[in-house]
């Protein structure tokens, strides 16, 4: 009468494989969702605005410094470089 091999390691290995596959599937779904959201923003930004200028784009950020609690209306902020200056610098 031979002793049977314990089933514990096989069950643990199956559970680990299932967990890894689940994590990969979740990461894939999240990646596809992020890609779809970015694609929607990209399609919206390609449309020209009514004034004939380029549409909004999520890839280029413009920064304006306005009066805030920290700067106050009296203290004038220095001009912020434009996005074109940034890309020229890069």
From Swiss-Prot:
GO terms for biological process: cellular response to amino acid stimulus; negative regulation of TORC1 signaling; regulation of skeletal muscle tissue regeneration. The keyword Transmembrane helix applies. Residues 1-18 are lumenal. This is Small regulatory polypeptide of amino acid response. Keywords: Endosome, Lysosome, Membrane, Transmembrane, Transmembrane helix. It is found in: Late endosome membrane; Lysosome membrane. Highly expressed in lung, heart and skeletal muscle. InterPro entries: SPAR.
């Amino acid at each position: 009468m031979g002793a049977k091999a314990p089933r514990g390691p096989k069950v643990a290995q199956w559970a680990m494989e299932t967990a890894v596959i689940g994590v990969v599937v979740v990461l894939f779904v999240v990646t596809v969702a992020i890609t779809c959201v970015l694609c929607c923003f990209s399609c919206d930004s390609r449309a020209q605005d009514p004034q004939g200028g380029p549409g909004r784009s999520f890839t280029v950020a413009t920064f304006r410094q306005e009066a805030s609690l920290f700067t106050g209306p009296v203290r004038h902020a220095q001009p912020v470089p434009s996005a074109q200056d940034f890309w020229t610098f890069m």
